[in-house]
Regions:
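Short helix-onset patch at the extreme N-terminus, typifying the N->h transition
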Residues: 7, 25-26
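Conserved NTP-donor binding/palm subdomain of two-metal-ion nucleotidyltransferases/polymerases, i.e.
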Residues: 20, 26, 32, 36-173, ...
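Extreme N-terminal basic, low-complexity initiation segments
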Residues: 2-11
C-alpha cells in the first residue's frame, strides 16, 4: 500500500475549493455564500487582513518591486524609506499574495526583527508544504503508473520547474493531477484505498455540477477537466483529449512526469487566475514567468483561446499581468483576445482604481469583473447585473436556506449511491 501524505491544515482558502470555484458557475456554495461574498483570507492565517490605505499602498509598491526586480535592489530601496509599521505588517500581505519566497529572498535582512521573524515562520511553513507536495508527487506517480493511468501535473510544481529560473522561491500548497475522465473513478478509488479522503463529500452537489475536480485530504487535487462546473464547460469548448495529446515531460523532485504544452499552460494559468478574481500577485507572476521562460507561441495561444471560447478570460489576465508586472504581452495579442475597445478600457479602469497589488479584505470591482467573466462581454455584463440585483434583494444565507429546504423535500439517497451517480455522470460525458 502506498500511503499518501497528510496535508498541512490552516492554509487559508484553497483555489480549488467550492467557495473559490463557485465564481465559475455563479451558484451558491454548500457553505451558503457565493465566492464573491467571501473575505480575502491571508494564507496560513485565520485572520483577514485589515490595513489602512497608506500601508496597503506601501505593500503594493514593495511586493511589486520584489517581483519585478529579481536582484531585490528596488525593494530594498523602498524599504529604506518605508515607515516601520508598514514593514512590520508586510509579511501578512506577502502571505496573502503567496509571494513569501520572493519577499524573503529580497527583503528578509531589511525588515525589523519582529517582521523578519514572522517572515521566517511563513517561509518555514511554505518549505514544509513544498516537501509534502514533492513527497506526494512521487507516491502519486507510483500509484497511477502501477495502475496504468496516464496523468498530467499542472500549475504549481510544473510551472515552478519550467517557468522559474529560481524555482525554489516559487512555493506551492497542493498537487494538481489531471487524469482522463474515463480514468477518474479508478484514480479516486486508488487514492481512497491508500488513505486519501474527499475533503467535501457533498455528492449531490458534485453530481449536479458534474464537478471537474475533487480535493483530497492528502493535498492532492484530482481533476478530469480544467474547469470545475458543467455550466462553464458547456459554454466553452476545451477538449481534454486535445490537451493530453500535446503533453510534454518535466523533471520534478528527481522524477519525470508529464504536463501541458507552453500554450496550454499559459491558457490554463490565465483561466484559473481569472475565475479566482485575478487577486493574487503569484498568479500574475506565473503568467509573466511562463511568457518569459516557457515561451508559448502567441499564434497558438490566440487560436486555442478563441476556438475554446476562453479568450476573454485569458486576455483579461494577460492585460492585468502586463499592467502590474510589465509582462511582455504584445498589444495585438490583447486586442485580438479582447476585441472590444470599450471593454478593454473598462478593465483597465477597474485595475487602475482598485489595484490588485494592494491587499484588501474583500473583493473589489476589479476582482468581481474577473470572477464574473463569461464567454462574451454581453453575458458578463448580464451576470454582473444579476449579482448586483441579488445582493440588493436577499442575502446569500437566505438564498441557501431556501434552496436547502427545497432540497430536503426529496427522497433520501445513500452517500454511496450519490457518489456512484456522480462518477457515472463524469464517465458518461461527451
Amino acid at each position: 500500500m502506498i500511503g499518501l501524505g497528510v496535508a498541512l491544515s490552516q492554509k487559508g482558502e484553497h483555489p480549488g475549493s467550492h467557495m473559490a470555484q463557485a465564481a465559475a458557475s455563479r451558484q451558491v456554495t454548500p457553505e451558503g455564500r457565493t465566492s464573491i461574498d467571501r473575505p480575502y483570507v491571508a494564507a496560513n492565517s485565520d485572520e483577514t487582513i485589515r490595513l489602512p490605505v497608506r500601508a496597503r499602498r506601501w505593500h503594493a509598491k514593495i511586493l511589486r518591486a520584489c517581483l519585478r526586480d529579481s536582484t531585490g535592489k528596488q525593494a530594498r530601496a523602498l524599504a529604506l524609506v518605508a515607515p516601520e509599521d508598514v514593514l512590520r505588517t508586510l509579511p501578512a500581505s506577502a502571505a496573502l499574495h503567496r509571494v513569501v519566497g520572493p519577499l524573503h529572498e529580497s527583503l528578509r535582512e531589511s525588515l525589523p526583527p519582529d517582521a523578519a521573524g514572522r517572515l521566517d515562520a511563513l517561509f518555514r511553513e511554505e518549505c514544509a508544504r513544498h516537501l509534502l507536495v514533492t513527497s506526494n508527487l512521487r507516491r502519486v506517480q507510483e500509484l497511477l503508473e502501477r495502475a496504468g493511468i496516464p496523468f498530467l501535473v499542472v500549475k504549481g510544481p510544473a510551472v515552478a520547474a519550467l517557468a522559474y529560473r529560481r524555482p525554489r522561491i516559487r512555493f506551492y500548497q497542493d498537487l494538481d493531477i489531471v487524469v482522463r475522465r474515463q480514468h477518474f473513478a479508478t484514480a479516486l478509488d486508488l487514492f481512497e484505498a491508500n488513505g486519501a479522503q474527499v475533503v467535501d463529500p457533498n455528492w449531490p452537489y458534485h453530481s449536479e455540477h458534474v464537478a471537474g475536480e475533487l480535493r483530497l485530504s492528502t493535498g492532492v487535487d484530482l481533476h478530469w477537466h480544467l474547469l470545475f462546473f458543467q455550466e462553464l464547460r458547456s459554454a466553452t469548448a476545451i477538449r481534454m483529449d486535445e490537451i493530453f495529446s500535446r503533453e510534454r515531460p518535466v523533471s520534478l523532485a528527481g522524477t519525470t512526469v508529464l504536463t501541458t504544452d507552453p500554450a496550454d499552460t499559459l491558457i490554463h494559468l490565465s483561466l484559473h487566475a481569472c475565475l479566482e478574481g485575478g487577486s493574487r500577485l503569484i498568479w500574475l507572476k506565473d503568467i509573466e514567468r511562463s511568457i518569459a521562460n516557457d515561451a508559448p507561441a502567441w499564434e497558438d495561444v490566440i487560436e486555442r483561446s478563441l476556438r475554446w471560447r476562453v479568450n476573454l478570460f485569458v486576455g483579461t489576465m494577460l492585460m492585468r499581468s502586463r499592467s502590474v508586472l510589465d509582462t511582455p504581452v504584445p498589444d495585438e495579442v490583447v486586442a485580438t483576445l479582447l476585441p472590444s475597445r470599450a471593454w478593454r478600457a473598462t478593465l483597465s479602469a477597474a485595475d487602475r482604481l482598485f489595484p490588485i497589488a494592494s491587499p484588501r479584505r474583500r473583493e473589489t470591482p476589479a476582482t468581481l469583473v474577473a470572477q464574473g467573466m463569461q464567454v462574451d462581454v454581453k453575458s458578463t455584463v448580464s451576470f454582473l447585473t444579476r449579482v448586483a440585483a441579488r445582493r440588493g434583494l436577499t442575502s446569500a444565507a437566505e438564498l441557501f436556506r431556501r434552496q436547502g429546504e427545497e432540497a430536503d423535500t426529496g427522497a433520501h439517497v445513500s452517500a454511496g449511491e450519490e457518489r456512484a451517480a456522480f462518477l457515472a455522470r463524469v464517465a458518461s460525458g461527451p
